[in-house]
Amino acid sequence: ELLDEHSGLQTPKLWQADSVPEENWSDWLRIFKSFLRTKLVDVISPGFKSIHRLGALLPHECVTIQGLSFRSMQFHAIHRVDAYHEWLSACDWRPAYLWHERYLKILASENPGKRWLLKAPGHMLGISALRKQYPDAKFIQLHRRPSEVIPSMASLYASLRSGSSNKVDFEELGKSLVEEWRVGLTRVLELRGSDSMVDQDCLDIDYQEMTGDPLTVVEKITEFLELPLVPDPRFKMREYLLRNRKGKHGSH
């Protein structure tokens, strides 16, 4: 969300990912339908907004667009589907990124000239297919302690699953997340280790640095992307940080 304040970057918004663009759908209707979906999440999973900000006009992770090709971490996040989860770790991700690129091209036709800023944990699983589909992509890899990542993700998954089930198996959840992230990180490290060009296109950011001094990290990222950080985006980012202090909607 902070990087989305930069005038040279654009992100898929939730309302854009929620509804495939159609000629007979006006934007306001798609935005309203997406807004209603966020309110439904508030009802069935009341604690979710303290874990992850969700809004029709906010930047949205790629999990929803990936889901249109039936390759997305979101399905196992919301429901316990062990067979699908096992398949997802071994499937061919190329169809997901072929569709993903087509989708972004449609969105970009309404706002051309800006660079896409994308985010989703599932990109780790399909990192090789992503690289082939987007050979000029730059990667920002965030490094955080596994002892913090897994409980955080488990909390998010448990909140989502509680909306559709009266029982959440936390032991299963923890084990599946550890395996999911092990597979994803292994693929990222193997690709970076086997292709020096990919490694050069990666910027490593420490999570503690990001939370402690976000504007300095933003400057590193914009320099890495060769984007100017002029006064206006910097001011907008400071305003964003003041409006959205950590813990504003609770903690988990």
Sequence positions of predicted segments:
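A structural motif corresponding to the C-terminal end of an alpha-helix
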Residues: 106-110, 187-202
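Conserved phosphate-donor/acceptor-positioning beta-strand/loop module used by diverse small-molecule
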Residues: 119-120, 130-155
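PAPS-dependent sulfotransferase catalytic core
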Residues: 151-183, 234-252
